[in-house]
Amino acid sequence: MVELEKNEKINRLIALTKSDSGISGPELAKAHMKLGRLLAESSFMELDPDDTTVVAIMRGGIFFAEGIYFALSCKFMMYNPKTDDWKRPETKNVILADSVINTGRTIAGIFDDETKIASCVINEKAVPLY
C-alpha cells in the first residue's frame, strides 16, 4: 500500500473529499480526480501502461480511478460489487481504486498478491487486511 506525502495541497484536496466538507458535484469529482492523478504520479509511473488496468470500484471510486487512468494512460474498467462477478483483468498490474475503504470486505474478496490498492481514505481497521 502506498501513501501520498502530505502537504498543504494534498490536505486541502482530502478535506474537500470528506463527507462533512459540504462539497458535492463537479468540485468533489475534480478533487477526487486530482488526488488520483497525484497518487499515480508519485507511486505508479514505473508501471507499463500497456500491462496495467485501473479498476474503479463503483460508485465512489470512479473519479479517483479516472485521475489514475489519465495520469498513467493505461487500461480502465469498472467493477460494481453489488451487481458484477469479479474477473481479474488480464494485465500484469491491477490497481483497485476506491475513494473510501471502510471495512475492506469488498476489496478483500478480489485482492491478490499482484494487486495494488489506491484509496483516498482507508479506515484503520481495514489496513491489516492488506
Where are these regions (language model features)?
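PRPP-associated nucleotide enzymes
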Residues: 1-130
